[in-house]
From Swiss-Prot:
GO MF terms, alphabetically ordered: glutamate-5-semialdehyde dehydrogenase activity; NADP binding
Gene name, Swiss-Prot/TrEMBL: proA
Species of provenance: Caulobacter vibrioides (strain ATCC 19089 / CIP 103742 / CB 15) (Caulobacter crescentus)
Gene3D superfamilies per the UniProt record, alphabetical: Aldehyde Dehydrogenase, Chain A, domain 1, Aldehyde Dehydrogenase, Chain A, domain 2
Lineage: Bacteria, Pseudomonadati, Pseudomonadota, Alphaproteobacteria, Caulobacterales
Subcellular location as annotated: Cytoplasm
Name of the protein described by the UniProt record: Gamma-glutamyl phosphate reductase
Enzyme Commission code: 1.2.1.41
Catalyzed reaction equations: L-glutamate 5-semialdehyde + phosphate + NADP(+) = L-glutamyl 5-phosphate + NADPH + H(+)
Length: 413
């Protein structure tokens, strides 16, 4: 493991000094290799699925793990999308000239060596590799033991893509052991060779990484996402957005987990929204006010407001306007993604101002909380901390900066 850190440093230097065209070629070659290795990757995934089912995994958790031909094509297409994203390395984000003639530029640079610790989703292996190469960073990938065969098969394709482009395979390494001790070594910093650790998974994984890591951590908390239907909402729009936000794909972190209804119009808004959700197979758990309108709902507990279901279950609360919605979100949300449905521009602006989440949407589904949907090609996660990045983390967010100062012989008096 310690050797991985040292070779990753060498890989990071090679990526940093590579041309944008070389990095693009490597990412494109990764996508080609993933398609070429489709049979091997799907066979490996079948092994992971069989073991997961034998261990009692089912429902959304099994869905997160599963690949089929269509999903694998989506993985390859996602890698290609990253190749099409502008290369951020070396880009001057600002530039100015001082009165003494010094020319100063703020220039994007790679972070260095990134360690990615994640669970379940094998597509993260490809997304993280592509984004790190695009941003000039080396990466050490430590996926969960539940998808180790899938991850290693995808990594083999990625390594071949790097080789085809003439870049070192040390730039993207995968931890090949399921031993949990490997995570501890990464958290210890691998002899100070890791510049950033990114955890992506359940609350316990993120909490452990944040508590034990000796390197900086880019946090990705669970998606305790809310949709607030304001009194001035268009009812048809509200029904469509709420159903999509919850049920399009319940196992993603952008899935809505709580529905907030404005008490000023709850009697009108809640029944048709609840009816559409129930008909679509969603279980509703409401507070007293919500159940007074829709008695068929189960009673919501305090735990429901802080639970990322990742299942067709939705908590429902009636709140007092924008201020009440913002208070509920501040009390129970995770700072991930929250939305308002309204035709009132002032209410929308108030919601935007009051809700301090990484992503705030107006009249759109929370399922748009995705780097691909933001035009980033893919994402390495949704950062819920405020430093150093926030929201979908794409290639640009995986860079830092340096100041380049050009002079003509100036000395300081």
């Amino acid at each position: 493991m310690a050797g991985m850190g040292r070779t990753a440093r060498e890989g990071a230097r090679a990526l940093r000094l590579a041309t944008p065209e070389q990095r693009t070629a490597a990412i494109q070659a990764m996508a080609v290799a993933i398609r070429e290795d489709a049979d091997a990757i799907l066979t490996a995934n079948a092994k992971d699925l069989a073991r997961a089912e034998a261990n009692g995994v089912s429902g959304p958790m099994l869905d997160r793990l599963a690949l089929d031909a269509a999903r694998l094509e989506g993985v390859a297409a996602g890698v290609e999308a990253v190749a099409a994203v502008p290369d951020p390395v070396g880009v001057a984000t600002s530039r100015w000239t001082r009165p003494n003639g010094l020319d100063i530029a703020r220039v994007r640079t790679p972070i260095g060596v990134i360690a990615m610790i994640y669970e379940s989703r094998p597509n993260v292996t490809a997304d993280a590799a592509a984004l790190c190469v695009r941003s000039g960073n080396a990466v050490i990938l430590r996926g969960g033991s539940e998808c180790i065969h899938s991850n290693l098969a995808i990594h083999a394709a990625i390594a071949r893509g790097l080789q085809k482009a003439g870049l070192p395979t040390a730039a993207v390494q995968a931890v090949k052991t399921p031993d949990r001790a490997a995570v501890g070594m990464i958290l210890a910093g691998l002899d100070r060779t890791i510049d950033l650790i990114i955890p992506r998974g359940g609350k316990s994984l993120v909490a452990r990484v944040q508590a034990e890591a000796r390197a900086p951590v880019l946090g990705h908390l669970e998606g305790l996402n809310h949709v607030f239907v304001h009194a001035a909402a268009d009812l048809k729009k509200a029904v469509e957005v709420v159903v999509n936000a919850k049920l399009r794909r319940v196992s993603v972190c952008g899935s809505a987990e709580t529905l907030l209804i404005d008490q000023a119009a709850a009697d009108k808004l809640l029944p048709p929204i609840a009816d559409a959700l129930i008909k679509a197979g969603c279980e509703l758990r409401g507070d007293a006010a919500a159940r007074a309108i829709e008695p068929t709902m189960k009673k919501a507990t305090v735990e429901d407001w802080t639970t990322e279901y990742l299942a067709p279950i939705l908590s429902v609360a009636v709140v007092d306007g924008v201020a009440g919605a913002a208070r509920h979100i501040a009390s129970y949300g995770s700072g991930h993604t929250d939305a308002i449905i309204t035709e009132d521009a002032a209410a929308a602006e108030a919601f935007i101002a009051e809700v301090d989440s990484a992503i705030v949407l107006v009249n759109a589904s929370t399922q748009f909380a995705d780097g691909g949907e933001f035009g980033f090609g893919a994402e390495i996660g949704i950062a819920t901390d405020k430093l150093h990045a926030r929201g979908p983390v794409g290639a640009e967010q995986l860079t830092t900066f340096k100041y380049v100062v050009r002079g003509t012989g100036q000395t300081r008096p």
